[in-house]
Amino acid sequence: MKPFWEDEYLNKEKSTFGNPSKEVKELVPYLKKDAKILDVGCGDGRHALYLAGLGFQVDAFDLSKNAIEKIDYLKQKNNLNIHTWICDVLDYPFRYSYDLIIVHGVLQFIDKTKQPQVIELLKKWTNVNG
């Protein structure tokens, strides 16, 4: 049985999970203007789209093809620069160190035996002052 959000992602005009989270919005004043941000398990992009709209460099990935297709549609429509991938966190093609990595509502869906490996990868991908 597929998760409910797979069908929700097909509606390209409505955010599946609403506005960006309060926690992500609160981090914005602490970011450099040229901050590099990674959104892990980005869903339909509520955080990636918001942050790219503020001018940050954003990479985002999710397992869901529907989610990434929705982000790609919205980034084109709004002329935003977001690099997207359809992949698992363990298969992400690491590009560079990030100032901020968002993992919002994702860890609980990762196999518990793989969570320590994922945490180590996230630490490795984060800048020293990130």
What function would you assign to each model-found segment?
Residues 102:
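A conserved beta-strand element that flanks and buttresses the S-adenosyl-L-methionine
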Residues 71-72:
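Conserved SAM-binding loop
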Residues 116-128:
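A short glycine-rich, Lys/Arg-flanked "PGG" loop and its adjoining helix->strand segment in the class I
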Residues 1-32, 34-43:
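Conserved class I S-adenosyl-L-methionine
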Residues 64-66:
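Conserved SAM/SAH-binding beta-strand->alpha-helix loop
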Residues 57-62:
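Conserved SAM-binding motif I beta-strand of class I
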Residues 78-89:
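Conserved SAM-binding strand-loop segment of SAM-dependent methyltransferases
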